[in-house]
Protein backbone atom coordinates (compact mmCIF):
# COMPACT_ATOMS: atom_id res chain seq x y z
CA UNK A 1 0.00 0.00 0.00
CA UNK A 2 2.81 2.38 0.95
CA UNK A 3 4.63 1.52 -2.28
CA UNK A 4 1.53 2.30 -4.35
CA UNK A 5 1.16 5.62 -2.50
CA UNK A 6 4.77 6.55 -3.27
CA UNK A 7 4.22 5.60 -6.92
CA UNK A 8 1.15 7.85 -7.12
CA UNK A 9 2.99 10.79 -5.54
CA UNK A 10 5.92 10.27 -7.94
CA UNK A 11 3.52 10.33 -10.90
CA UNK A 12 1.93 13.57 -9.70
CA UNK A 13 5.30 15.29 -9.14
CA UNK A 14 7.38 13.79 -11.97
CA UNK A 15 4.81 12.40 -14.40
CA UNK A 16 3.99 13.70 -17.86
CA UNK A 17 2.43 17.15 -17.56
CA UNK A 18 0.78 16.69 -20.98
CA UNK A 19 -1.10 13.61 -19.80
CA UNK A 20 -2.06 15.28 -16.52
CA UNK A 21 -3.39 18.36 -18.34
CA UNK A 22 -5.36 16.07 -20.66
CA UNK A 23 -6.87 14.33 -17.62
CA UNK A 24 -7.73 17.71 -16.06
CA UNK A 25 -9.29 18.87 -19.32
CA UNK A 26 -11.46 15.75 -19.70
CA UNK A 27 -12.42 15.79 -16.00
CA UNK A 28 -13.46 19.45 -16.25
CA UNK A 29 -15.64 18.75 -19.31
CA UNK A 30 -17.29 15.75 -17.62
CA UNK A 31 -17.97 17.67 -14.40
CA UNK A 32 -19.52 20.59 -16.30
CA UNK A 33 -21.69 18.16 -18.25
CA UNK A 34 -22.81 15.98 -15.31
CA UNK A 35 -23.00 18.55 -12.48
CA UNK A 36 -22.95 22.19 -13.67
CA UNK A 37 -23.65 23.61 -10.20
CA UNK A 38 -20.68 21.74 -8.72
CA UNK A 39 -18.52 22.79 -11.67
CA UNK A 40 -19.17 26.47 -10.93
CA UNK A 41 -18.02 25.99 -7.33
CA UNK A 42 -14.58 24.69 -8.38
CA UNK A 43 -13.81 27.90 -10.29
CA UNK A 44 -11.64 28.86 -7.29
CA UNK A 45 -9.01 26.37 -8.51
CA UNK A 46 -8.73 28.20 -11.82
CA UNK A 47 -8.71 31.59 -10.08
CA UNK A 48 -5.84 30.53 -7.81
CA UNK A 49 -3.84 29.13 -10.71
CA UNK A 50 -4.25 32.27 -12.84
CA UNK A 51 -3.38 34.38 -9.78
CA UNK A 52 -0.19 32.38 -9.23
CA UNK A 53 0.81 32.87 -12.87
CA UNK A 54 0.05 36.58 -12.64
CA UNK A 55 2.21 36.88 -9.52
CA UNK A 56 5.27 35.00 -10.76
CA UNK A 57 5.45 36.14 -14.41
CA UNK A 58 6.82 39.70 -13.88
CA UNK A 59 9.59 38.50 -11.54
CA UNK A 60 10.42 35.65 -13.91
CA UNK A 61 10.86 37.90 -16.97
CA UNK A 62 12.93 40.44 -15.00
CA UNK A 63 15.40 37.99 -13.44
CA UNK A 64 15.81 35.77 -16.52
CA UNK A 65 16.55 38.61 -18.92
CA UNK A 66 18.92 40.29 -16.47
CA UNK A 67 20.74 37.01 -15.79
CA UNK A 68 21.09 36.03 -19.45
CA UNK A 69 22.58 39.41 -20.39
CA UNK A 70 24.85 39.64 -17.34
CA UNK A 71 26.26 36.14 -17.93
CA UNK A 72 26.60 36.46 -21.71
CA UNK A 73 30.02 35.49 -23.07
CA UNK A 74 31.40 36.46 -26.46
CA UNK A 75 30.87 33.53 -28.79
CA UNK A 76 33.66 31.78 -30.62
CA UNK A 77 34.21 32.70 -34.25
CA UNK A 78 32.20 30.36 -36.47
CA UNK A 79 30.00 30.52 -39.55
CA UNK A 80 26.85 31.05 -37.51
CA UNK A 81 26.16 34.62 -38.64
CA UNK A 82 24.16 33.53 -41.74
CA UNK A 83 22.36 30.94 -39.61
CA UNK A 84 21.54 33.62 -37.05
CA UNK A 85 20.13 35.78 -39.87
CA UNK A 86 17.89 32.89 -40.97
CA UNK A 87 16.76 32.36 -37.37
CA UNK A 88 15.76 36.03 -37.12
CA UNK A 89 14.08 36.07 -40.54
CA UNK A 90 12.15 32.89 -39.82
CA UNK A 91 10.93 34.14 -36.45
CA UNK A 92 9.79 37.47 -37.91
CA UNK A 93 8.03 35.81 -40.86
CA UNK A 94 6.30 33.45 -38.41
CA UNK A 95 4.93 36.45 -36.52
CA UNK A 96 3.76 38.00 -39.82
CA UNK A 97 2.01 34.77 -40.84
CA UNK A 98 0.31 34.59 -37.43
CA UNK A 99 -0.89 38.20 -37.64
CA UNK A 100 -2.17 37.63 -41.19
CA UNK A 101 -3.94 34.45 -40.12
CA UNK A 102 -5.58 36.24 -37.19
CA UNK A 103 -6.82 39.00 -39.50
CA UNK A 104 -8.22 36.49 -42.01
CA UNK A 105 -9.84 34.33 -39.31
CA UNK A 106 -10.58 36.64 -36.33
CA UNK A 107 -11.54 34.64 -33.25
CA UNK A 108 -12.98 35.80 -29.91
CA UNK A 109 -12.22 34.16 -26.57
CA UNK A 110 -14.41 33.64 -23.52
CA UNK A 111 -12.89 36.02 -20.96
CA UNK A 112 -14.15 37.62 -17.75
CA UNK A 113 -13.78 41.30 -18.63
CA UNK A 114 -16.68 42.94 -16.81
CA UNK A 115 -14.64 44.37 -13.96
CA UNK A 116 -11.37 44.79 -15.84
CA UNK A 117 -10.08 48.22 -16.72
CA UNK A 118 -8.94 48.79 -20.30
CA UNK A 119 -7.31 51.70 -22.08
CA UNK A 120 -6.98 50.65 -25.73
CA UNK A 121 -4.75 52.90 -27.88
CA UNK A 122 -6.30 54.76 -30.81
CA UNK A 123 -3.50 54.36 -33.39
CA UNK A 124 0.16 53.51 -33.93
CA UNK A 125 1.30 56.85 -32.50
CA UNK A 126 -0.55 56.14 -29.27
CA UNK A 127 0.97 52.65 -29.14
CA UNK A 128 4.52 53.99 -29.56
CA UNK A 129 3.86 56.76 -27.04
CA UNK A 130 2.55 54.22 -24.55
CA UNK A 131 5.59 51.99 -25.11
CA UNK A 132 7.99 54.88 -24.47
CA UNK A 133 6.16 55.89 -21.30
CA UNK A 134 6.26 52.29 -20.07
CA UNK A 135 10.00 52.03 -20.78
CA UNK A 136 10.83 54.79 -18.27
CA UNK A 137 8.39 53.56 -15.61
CA UNK A 138 9.50 53.06 -12.02
CA UNK A 139 10.88 49.48 -11.83
CA UNK A 140 9.01 48.67 -8.61
CA UNK A 141 5.74 49.90 -10.10
CA UNK A 142 6.52 47.96 -13.29
CA UNK A 143 6.82 44.73 -11.28
CA UNK A 144 3.71 45.49 -9.20
CA UNK A 145 1.54 46.43 -12.17
CA UNK A 146 2.84 43.83 -14.63
CA UNK A 147 4.32 46.49 -16.95
CA UNK A 148 6.43 44.10 -19.03
CA UNK A 149 7.89 46.80 -21.26
CA UNK A 150 9.28 48.57 -18.20
CA UNK A 151 10.43 45.26 -16.72
CA UNK A 152 12.31 44.43 -19.93
CA UNK A 153 13.91 47.87 -20.09
CA UNK A 154 15.21 47.70 -16.52
CA UNK A 155 16.28 44.06 -16.87
CA UNK A 156 18.27 44.84 -20.03
CA UNK A 157 19.85 47.93 -18.46
CA UNK A 158 20.84 46.14 -15.26
CA UNK A 159 22.05 43.11 -17.23
CA UNK A 160 24.37 45.26 -19.36
CA UNK A 161 25.67 47.06 -16.27
CA UNK A 162 26.28 43.76 -14.46
CA UNK A 163 28.35 42.32 -17.31
CA UNK A 164 31.30 44.10 -15.71
CA UNK A 165 30.51 42.76 -12.23
CA UNK A 166 32.55 40.17 -10.36
CA UNK A 167 32.06 36.51 -11.26
CA UNK A 168 30.60 35.86 -7.81
CA UNK A 169 27.91 38.50 -8.46
CA UNK A 170 27.07 36.99 -11.86
CA UNK A 171 26.91 33.56 -10.26
CA UNK A 172 24.50 34.87 -7.61
CA UNK A 173 22.23 36.37 -10.28
CA UNK A 174 22.32 33.10 -12.22
CA UNK A 175 21.40 31.17 -9.06
CA UNK A 176 18.52 33.59 -8.45
CA UNK A 177 17.22 33.00 -11.98
CA UNK A 178 17.43 29.24 -11.42
CA UNK A 179 15.52 29.63 -8.14
CA UNK A 180 12.74 31.70 -9.74
CA UNK A 181 12.55 29.24 -12.63
CA UNK A 182 12.13 26.42 -10.11
CA UNK A 183 9.24 28.30 -8.47
CA UNK A 184 7.62 28.69 -11.90
CA UNK A 185 8.04 24.96 -12.55
CA UNK A 186 6.15 24.27 -9.30
CA UNK A 187 3.36 26.63 -10.36
CA UNK A 188 3.18 24.99 -13.79
CA UNK A 189 2.86 21.55 -12.13
CA UNK A 190 -0.51 22.77 -10.82
CA UNK A 191 -1.69 23.43 -14.39
CA UNK A 192 -3.86 20.26 -14.53
CA UNK A 193 -5.75 21.34 -11.39
CA UNK A 194 -6.03 24.94 -12.59
CA UNK A 195 -7.23 23.87 -16.03
CA UNK A 196 -9.75 21.50 -14.43
CA UNK A 197 -11.22 24.46 -12.53
CA UNK A 198 -11.09 26.81 -15.52
CA UNK A 199 -12.65 24.39 -18.01
CA UNK A 200 -15.39 23.10 -15.72
CA UNK A 201 -16.42 26.60 -14.58
CA UNK A 202 -16.24 28.09 -18.09
CA UNK A 203 -18.35 25.35 -19.69
CA UNK A 204 -20.84 25.36 -16.80
CA UNK A 205 -21.34 29.11 -17.19
CA UNK A 206 -21.15 29.52 -20.99
CA UNK A 207 -22.02 26.07 -22.35
CA UNK A 208 -20.03 23.90 -24.73
CA UNK A 209 -19.71 26.76 -27.24
CA UNK A 210 -16.61 27.81 -25.29
CA UNK A 211 -14.91 24.55 -26.29
CA UNK A 212 -15.74 25.20 -29.94
CA UNK A 213 -13.88 28.50 -29.63
CA UNK A 214 -10.83 26.65 -28.32
CA UNK A 215 -10.95 24.20 -31.24
CA UNK A 216 -11.16 27.08 -33.74
CA UNK A 217 -8.25 28.81 -32.02
CA UNK A 218 -6.19 25.63 -32.17
CA UNK A 219 -6.98 25.21 -35.88
CA UNK A 220 -5.74 28.75 -36.62
CA UNK A 221 -2.56 28.19 -34.57
CA UNK A 222 -1.73 24.85 -36.18
CA UNK A 223 -2.56 26.16 -39.66
CA UNK A 224 -0.13 29.06 -39.25
CA UNK A 225 2.57 26.63 -38.06
CA UNK A 226 1.94 24.37 -41.07
CA UNK A 227 2.24 27.36 -43.41
CA UNK A 228 5.61 28.15 -41.83
CA UNK A 229 6.83 24.54 -42.00
CA UNK A 230 5.65 23.75 -45.54
CA UNK A 231 5.66 27.11 -47.35
CA UNK A 232 7.71 29.89 -45.74
CA UNK A 233 10.63 27.83 -44.42
CA UNK A 234 11.10 26.03 -47.78
CA UNK A 235 11.14 29.43 -49.51
CA UNK A 236 13.83 30.67 -47.11
CA UNK A 237 15.88 27.50 -47.67
CA UNK A 238 15.47 27.76 -51.45
CA UNK A 239 16.72 31.36 -51.31
CA UNK A 240 19.81 30.02 -49.54
CA UNK A 241 20.63 26.80 -51.45
CA UNK A 242 18.97 27.55 -54.84
CA UNK A 243 17.52 24.06 -55.33
CA UNK A 244 14.50 21.99 -54.29
CA UNK A 245 14.28 22.45 -50.50
CA UNK A 246 11.57 19.88 -49.76
CA UNK A 247 13.76 16.75 -49.39
CA UNK A 248 15.68 18.59 -46.66
CA UNK A 249 12.49 20.06 -45.15
CA UNK A 250 10.74 16.68 -44.89
CA UNK A 251 13.88 14.99 -43.53
CA UNK A 252 14.11 17.59 -40.74
CA UNK A 253 10.39 17.32 -39.92
CA UNK A 254 10.56 13.52 -39.90
CA UNK A 255 13.72 13.09 -37.82
CA UNK A 256 13.73 16.20 -35.63
CA UNK A 257 10.14 17.44 -35.66
CA UNK A 258 8.48 14.17 -34.67
CA UNK A 259 10.82 13.67 -31.70
CA UNK A 260 10.41 17.27 -30.55
CA UNK A 261 6.62 16.92 -30.78
CA UNK A 262 6.67 14.31 -28.02
CA UNK A 263 9.52 15.67 -25.89
CA UNK A 264 8.04 19.21 -26.00
CA UNK A 265 11.51 20.60 -25.31
CA UNK A 266 13.93 22.19 -27.77
CA UNK A 267 16.73 21.66 -25.26
CA UNK A 268 15.91 17.96 -24.90
CA UNK A 269 15.94 17.64 -28.69
CA UNK A 270 19.47 19.09 -29.07
CA UNK A 271 21.14 15.62 -29.09
CA UNK A 272 18.70 14.48 -31.81
CA UNK A 273 19.53 17.50 -33.96
CA UNK A 274 23.27 17.07 -33.35
CA UNK A 275 23.11 13.43 -34.44
CA UNK A 276 21.18 14.40 -37.57
CA UNK A 277 23.76 17.07 -38.46
CA UNK A 278 26.51 14.50 -37.98
CA UNK A 279 24.75 12.05 -40.32
CA UNK A 280 24.46 14.79 -42.96
CA UNK A 281 28.22 15.49 -42.64
CA UNK A 282 27.70 19.14 -41.75
CA UNK A 283 30.49 21.28 -40.28
CA UNK A 284 30.90 20.30 -36.64
CA UNK A 285 32.30 23.71 -35.68
CA UNK A 286 29.11 25.25 -37.04
CA UNK A 287 26.35 22.95 -35.84
CA UNK A 288 27.90 22.48 -32.39
CA UNK A 289 27.18 26.19 -31.85
CA UNK A 290 24.13 26.81 -34.05
CA UNK A 291 21.97 23.97 -32.69
CA UNK A 292 22.18 25.02 -29.00
CA UNK A 293 21.84 28.64 -30.11
CA UNK A 294 18.74 27.77 -32.13
CA UNK A 295 17.21 25.99 -29.14
CA UNK A 296 17.51 29.32 -27.34
CA UNK A 297 16.55 31.99 -29.87
CA UNK A 298 14.98 30.31 -32.92
CA UNK A 299 11.34 30.35 -31.87
CA UNK A 300 9.08 30.32 -34.92
CA UNK A 301 6.38 28.41 -33.06
CA UNK A 302 6.39 30.91 -30.22
CA UNK A 303 6.26 33.76 -32.75
CA UNK A 304 3.03 32.21 -34.05
CA UNK A 305 1.46 31.58 -30.64
CA UNK A 306 2.02 35.05 -29.16
CA UNK A 307 0.27 37.18 -31.83
CA UNK A 308 -2.56 34.68 -32.47
CA UNK A 309 -3.59 34.60 -28.80
CA UNK A 310 -2.95 38.33 -28.36
CA UNK A 311 -5.14 39.25 -31.34
CA UNK A 312 -7.80 36.81 -30.15
CA UNK A 313 -7.92 38.81 -26.90
CA UNK A 314 -7.97 42.06 -28.88
CA UNK A 315 -10.92 40.79 -30.96
CA UNK A 316 -12.74 39.73 -27.80
CA UNK A 317 -12.40 43.21 -26.32
CA UNK A 318 -13.35 44.96 -29.56
CA UNK A 319 -10.09 46.91 -29.84
CA UNK A 320 -9.44 48.16 -33.41
CA UNK A 321 -6.04 47.31 -34.89
CA UNK A 322 -4.58 49.13 -37.91
CA UNK A 323 -1.88 47.79 -40.24
CA UNK A 324 1.08 49.70 -38.68
CA UNK A 325 0.10 48.45 -35.22
CA UNK A 326 -0.13 44.90 -36.58
CA UNK A 327 3.38 45.22 -38.04
CA UNK A 328 4.65 46.51 -34.69
CA UNK A 329 2.98 43.53 -33.00
CA UNK A 330 4.90 41.25 -35.40
CA UNK A 331 8.20 42.85 -34.35
CA UNK A 332 7.34 42.70 -30.64
CA UNK A 333 6.16 39.08 -30.98
CA UNK A 334 9.39 38.09 -32.74
CA UNK A 335 11.45 39.70 -29.97
CA UNK A 336 9.31 38.07 -27.28
CA UNK A 337 9.62 34.70 -29.02
CA UNK A 338 13.42 34.87 -28.86
CA UNK A 339 13.14 34.89 -25.07
CA UNK A 340 10.52 32.15 -24.86
CA UNK A 341 13.05 29.37 -24.25
CA UNK A 342 13.99 30.87 -20.89
CA UNK A 343 10.41 30.81 -19.62
CA UNK A 344 9.07 27.67 -17.99
CA UNK A 345 5.63 28.25 -19.50
CA UNK A 346 7.13 28.72 -22.94
CA UNK A 347 5.64 31.43 -25.13
CA UNK A 348 2.42 31.65 -23.12
CA UNK A 349 3.87 33.65 -20.23
CA UNK A 350 5.16 36.25 -22.69
CA UNK A 351 1.68 36.95 -24.06
CA UNK A 352 1.03 39.66 -21.42
CA UNK A 353 3.94 41.63 -22.85
CA UNK A 354 2.29 41.71 -26.28
CA UNK A 355 -1.14 42.36 -24.74
CA UNK A 356 0.24 45.42 -22.94
CA UNK A 357 0.66 47.10 -26.36
CA UNK A 358 -3.12 47.33 -26.59
CA UNK A 359 -3.78 48.51 -23.06
CA UNK A 360 -5.02 45.07 -22.00
CA UNK A 361 -4.69 44.61 -18.24
CA UNK A 362 -2.48 41.93 -16.73
CA UNK A 363 -5.56 40.26 -15.26
CA UNK A 364 -7.14 39.71 -18.69
CA UNK A 365 -3.78 38.76 -20.23
CA UNK A 366 -3.38 35.97 -17.68
CA UNK A 367 -6.82 34.64 -18.61
CA UNK A 368 -5.50 34.45 -22.18
CA UNK A 369 -2.49 32.51 -20.86
CA UNK A 370 -4.90 30.11 -19.16
CA UNK A 371 -6.70 29.59 -22.49
CA UNK A 372 -3.31 28.84 -24.04
CA UNK A 373 -2.65 26.22 -21.38
CA UNK A 374 -6.00 24.57 -22.11
CA UNK A 375 -5.02 24.02 -25.76
CA UNK A 376 -1.36 23.57 -24.81
CA UNK A 377 -1.45 19.78 -25.09
CA UNK A 378 -1.29 20.16 -28.88
CA UNK A 379 -0.14 23.77 -29.21
CA UNK A 380 3.06 23.35 -27.20
CA UNK A 381 3.97 20.09 -28.94
CA UNK A 382 3.46 21.59 -32.41
CA UNK A 383 5.32 24.75 -31.39
CA UNK A 384 8.34 22.80 -30.15
CA UNK A 385 8.30 20.60 -33.25
CA UNK A 386 8.44 23.65 -35.53
CA UNK A 387 11.11 25.35 -33.39
CA UNK A 388 13.46 22.39 -33.17
CA UNK A 389 13.13 21.11 -36.74
CA UNK A 390 13.88 24.61 -38.02
CA UNK A 391 17.14 24.67 -36.03
CA UNK A 392 18.59 21.78 -38.02
CA UNK A 393 16.90 22.90 -41.26
CA UNK A 394 18.55 26.33 -41.30
CA UNK A 395 21.88 24.94 -40.10
CA UNK A 396 21.89 22.39 -42.93
CA UNK A 397 20.85 25.02 -45.49
CA UNK A 398 23.72 27.36 -44.56
CA UNK A 399 26.28 24.53 -44.46
CA UNK A 400 25.17 23.22 -47.86
CA UNK A 401 25.20 26.73 -49.33
CA UNK A 402 28.73 27.23 -47.97
CA UNK A 403 29.86 23.89 -49.46
CA UNK A 404 28.37 24.88 -52.83
CA UNK A 405 30.17 28.22 -52.69
CA UNK A 406 33.52 26.59 -51.89
CA UNK A 407 33.06 24.04 -54.69
CA UNK A 408 32.21 26.84 -57.12
CA UNK A 409 35.29 28.82 -56.05
CA UNK A 410 37.53 25.76 -56.55
CA UNK A 411 36.14 25.19 -60.05
CA UNK A 412 36.70 28.84 -60.89
CA UNK A 413 40.32 28.66 -59.70
CA UNK A 414 40.98 25.53 -61.80
CA UNK A 415 39.59 27.19 -64.88
Curated annotation (Swiss-Prot):
Localization, UniProt: Cell inner membrane
Top-level lineage group: Bacteria
GO molecular function: neutral L-amino acid:sodium symporter activity
InterPro entries recorded: Na-dicarboxylate_symporter (IPR001991), Na:dicarbo_symporter_sf (IPR036458), Ser_Thr_transp_SstT (IPR023025)
Gene Ontology biological process terms in this record: serine transport; threonine transport
Entry keyword Transmembrane helix: yes
Topology class, membrane: Multi-pass membrane protein
Primary role: Involved in the import of serine and threonine into the cell, with the concomitant import of sodium (symport system).
Reactions it catalyzes: L-serine(in) + Na(+)(in) = L-serine(out) + Na(+)(out); L-threonine(in) + Na(+)(in) = L-threonine(out) + Na(+)(out)
Family per similarity comment: Belongs to the dicarboxylate/amino acid:cation symporter (DAACS) (TC 2.A.23) family.
Transmembrane segments: 15-35, 45-65, 85-105, 142-162, 193-213, 217-237, 301-321, 331-351
GO cellular component entries: plasma membrane
UniProt keyword list: Amino-acid transport, Cell inner membrane, Cell membrane, Membrane, Symport, Transmembrane, Transmembrane helix, Transport
The protein's name in its UniProt record: Serine/threonine transporter SstT
